[in-house]
C-alpha cells in the first residue's frame, strides 16, 4: 500500500485482548498490498492492468473495488480516476477501503474503541472523541489544525506527505489551487477517494463537497488562506 499503518486500541474494560483480531487485521492489509499494489509486477492489479489477467480470474475484491471507483468517478465528474497519468492504479480508493476493512475486523471482534491510521488517513470507532492532527502543507513540522470527532473517518490529500502526486485528469497536470484538503465522513473508503477528487478539482472543490451528503472539508490554498465547508466547524478540535 506504500504507507505505514498504525493501530490504536485502548486497553479498557470491555475491550477484547489477545483474541487475534489485530493479527487478522494486519494479515488483511498484507493481502491487500500483495493483491492491489501497482508496484508489484505479480499483483492482480498489475497483471489486470497489463491485460495478462482477466477480471474473472482476479480476486473478487477487485471487481468490488472497480465498481466503487466507477461510482465515485461519476459522482466527481471524472476527477476521481483509476487511470491517473494513463496507468491503471486504483490506489486512490484502495488505501482507504483497506484501512476501513481493517477497522471493521476489530469491530467484529468486539473492539468498541479503536483507530486505524494509514499515512494520516484514519478510521475511528467508538464514543471516544478522537483528535487527529492535520499537517500544514506550507509549513513543515507544523499543524494546520486538529480534527476531532467520534466514530468517523478523516482523509487528507495534498502536497505535505508525498509532494505533487495527484493529477487533474482533464489537464494531465498537478492542480495548482490547493496545497491540501481534508475531508471528514463516516467511512474512509469514500472519504479518502473524495479527498483525492476534491484536490484534483482545485477551486471547484468547495462547492462540490458542500453538495455531498454527510461530508465536510477544510482546505489550505496554495497561496496560504484557508476555507472550510459550512458544517466543518463541529469537527475542529
Task: Indicate where each model-derived feature is located.
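Mature catalytic core of soluble alpha/beta enzymes
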Residues: 1-237
Amino acid at each position: 500500500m506504500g504507507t505505514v499503518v498504525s493501530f490504536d486500541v485502548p486497553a479498557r474494560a470491555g475491550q477484547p485482548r489477545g483474541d487475534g483480531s489485530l493479527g487478522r487485521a494486519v494479515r488483511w492489509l498484507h493481502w491487500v498490498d500483495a493483491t492491489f499494489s501497482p508496484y508489484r509486477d505479480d499483483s492482480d492489479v498489475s497483471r489486470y492492468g497489463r491485460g495478462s489477467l482477466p477480471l474473472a480470474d482476479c480476486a473478487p475484491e477487485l471487481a468490488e473495488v472497480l465498481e466503487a471507483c466507477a461510482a465515485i468517478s461519476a459522482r466527481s465528474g471524472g476527477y476521481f480516476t483509476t487511470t491517473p497519468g494513463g496507468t491503471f492504479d486504483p490506489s486512490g480508493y484502495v488505501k482507504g477501503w483497506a484501512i476501513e476493512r481493517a477497522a471493521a475486523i476489530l469491530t467484529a471482534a468486539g473492539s468498541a474503541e479503536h483507530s486505524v491510521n494509514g499515512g494520516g488517513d484514519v478510521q475511528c470507532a467508538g464514543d471516544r472523541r478522537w483528535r487527529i492532527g492535520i499537517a500544514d502543507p506550507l509549513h513543515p513540522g507544523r499543524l494546520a489544525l486538529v480534527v476531532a470527532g467520534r466514530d468517523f473517518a478523516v482523509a487528507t490529500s495534498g502536497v505535505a506527505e508525498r509532494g505533487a502526486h495527484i493529477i487533474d485528469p482533464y489537464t494531465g497536470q498537478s492542480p495548482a489551487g490547493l496545497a491540501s484538503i481534508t475531508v471528514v465522513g463516516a467511512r474512509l473508503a469514500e472519504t479518502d477517494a473524495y479527498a483525492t477528487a476534491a484536490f484534483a478539482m482545485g477551486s471547484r472543490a468547495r462547492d462540490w463537497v458542500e453538495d455531498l451528503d454527510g461530508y465536510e472539508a477544510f482546505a489550505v490554498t496554495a497561496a496560504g488562506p484557508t476555507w472550510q465547508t459550512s458544517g466543518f466547524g463541529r469537527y475542529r478540535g
